[in-house]
């Protein structure tokens, strides 16, 4: 995490100019965190179906480039009216996995290049991946990766859970005097 900006810099990805307009469906804590973490050059439209929650979003979303819309993010007419065809990214972050999957499919069909679906029902992850709806996030899998990282008590830089393959991949930082330095992987 402390080298993320450095890596972005040397990779030429300090910013993501290809993503400037983002639609977020759902007004839960994940949506709030995402909207508040966006850089200034990104504009977000958060669509929330619950009126009271939409009002609350106006208080907790501090990003001045975020607009709160009270409506149904599955309503294609609303999406068209709000300019979905000009969006480069669509994040479906409701508490309903099925809704998120279908919304991302609709966004893809409307021309959005990058879609993210929060899929909390682990039974749907494989199906969602096969539909090619974009990136799939699962809080349980994400949390499990971090718990696993803490349990190992090693100098691990990254742990990823591959839900479809039922596997974990860990990236370790190896000290310069370790026995495995300068050896072939096969050894």
Q: Where is each model-derived feature located?
A:
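Cytosolic regulatory regions of ion transport systems
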Residues: 1-187
């Amino acid at each position: 995490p402390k080298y993320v900006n450095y890596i972005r810099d040397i990779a030429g990805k300090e910013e993501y100019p290809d993503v400037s307009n983002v639609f977020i469906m759902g007004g839960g804590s994940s949506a709030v965190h995402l909207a508040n973490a966006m850089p200034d050059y990104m504009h977000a439209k958060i669509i929330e179906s619950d009126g009271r929650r939409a009002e609350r979003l106006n208080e907790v979303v501090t990003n001045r480039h975020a607009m709160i819309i009270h409506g149904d993010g599955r309503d294609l007419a609303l999406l068209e009216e709000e300019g979905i065809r000009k969006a480069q990214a669509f994040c479906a972050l409701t508490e309903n996995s099925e809704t998120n999957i279908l919304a991302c499919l609709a966004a893809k069909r409307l021309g959005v290049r990058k879609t993210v679906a929060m899929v909390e029902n682990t039974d749907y992850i494989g199906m969602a991946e096969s539909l090619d709806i974009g990136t799939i996030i699962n809080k349980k899998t994400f949390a499990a990766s971090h718990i696993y990282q803490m349990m190992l008590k090693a100098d691990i830089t990254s742990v990823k859970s591959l839900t479809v393959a039922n596997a974990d991949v860990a990236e370790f930082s190896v000290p310069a005097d370790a026995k495995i330095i300068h050896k072939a992987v096969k050894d």
